[in-house]
Each structure stands twice: as C-alpha cells, then as structure tokens.
Amino acid sequence: MAAQTQRAVLAGGCFWGMEELIRRLPGVTATRVGYTGGDVPNATYRNHGTHAEAIEILFDPEATDYRALLEFFFQIHDPSTKNRQGNDIGLSYRSAIYYVDDEQKRIAEDTIADVDASGLWPGKVVTEVEPVGPFWEAEPEHQDYLQRYPDGYTCHFPRPGWRLPARSGSEG
C-alpha cells in the first residue's frame, strides 16, 4: 500500500516561478500558490498584509522526500537575500520554510546548515523556519500561471551542477 501524501509549504519569491519548477519534480502530486506566514485573514493578492507568496506542495514520500524538495528549493532561489528575489523586493518575497511537524523542522534546520557550510551562495542563509499556519489560496489567475503564459515573468532557475553536499557528521 502506498504511503499517504505529505505536505510542504515553501516561500522563495514570486510564487509563479516556484510553482512551475517544483511541480515538475518526480513525486510531486499537486501544487497550489497562495499566501501564508502573515497577519491578514482571507489574504488576497491586493490585500495580503505581511504574508509571503508561497507554494503548497503535496508529494508522495515513496517517490521523493522532504530533504530533496528543500535541496531543490535552495537551488532555484537565492536564500541569502532578505526579502528579495531578483527584481522582486519586499516582505512578500522572503525566503521561508513553513514546517508541518518537528521532523520537517529538523530537516529544514539541517539543510540550512548544509547550505551555509557549502559556500554555494554568496552569503549566509536568511530563510525563516516557522510553523505552518493558515494557507490562503491565491486567486485562479495566479494558479498554474506559467503553464498558461510560458513566456511570463520568473526569477527562478535551476542551476546545472548545483549539488548540496552534506556537512561532515550530518545526517544529510
């Protein structure tokens, strides 16, 4: 019998590009974009207060794992810039991991330590690690945006050859 689907919630800049790249990963069964980590209930694009633009990911743990998702997340956005990705500046575009349980928190903290130790980014990781709260689904026009507009705006790119080594003594 297959394992139950697991959930991950990540923020790393504009949600269009994050969704388009993460949705393609083996084991990812569904994605949706929205707002989380902030102060406004029923957040919308025009009124999302201090929320981050985020992506909710459902994945099959028999086909991929949380660590693999995080490694890809750290490859496709710059986790060393605070409240910014490319031309997008502001709290909405911060880097954050919203964990659903203590195991995800531990994996997130270990992965961040590995990213910092790797020297793959020019500065230390500023990614926030917070418990997941309400996730407000974005409007339909934001869902699957780059599927509908393949030449639309994105500041997220896979970096060929980017491989995250585990720190010496880490569980990786």
UniProtKB/Swiss-Prot annotation:
Catalysis: reaction(s): L-methionyl-[protein] + [thioredoxin]-disulfide + H2O = L-methionyl-(S)-S-oxide-[protein] + [thioredoxin]-dithiol; [thioredoxin]-disulfide + L-methionine + H2O = L-methionine (S)-S-oxide + [thioredoxin]-dithiol
E.C. numbers: 1.8.4.11
GO molecular function annotations of the record: L-methionine-(S)-S-oxide reductase activity; peptide-methionine (S)-S-oxide reductase activity
One Gene Ontology cellular component annotation held by this UniProt entry: cytoplasm
Enzyme active site: C14
InterPro entries from the UniProt entry: Met_Sox_Rdtase_MsrA_dom, Met_Sox_Rdtase_MsrA_sf
UniProt-listed GO biological process terms: cellular response to oxidative stress; protein modification process
Oxidoreductase keyword on record: yes
Key words, A-Z: Oxidoreductase
HAMAP family named among the record's database cross-references: MsrA
Protein role: Has an important function as a repair enzyme for proteins that have been inactivated by oxidation. Catalyzes the reversible oxidation-reduction of methionine sulfoxide in proteins to methionine.
Entry similarity comment: Belongs to the MsrA Met sulfoxide reductase family.
NCBIfam families named in the record: msrA
The protein's name: Peptide methionine sulfoxide reductase MsrA
Name of the gene this protein is made from: msrA
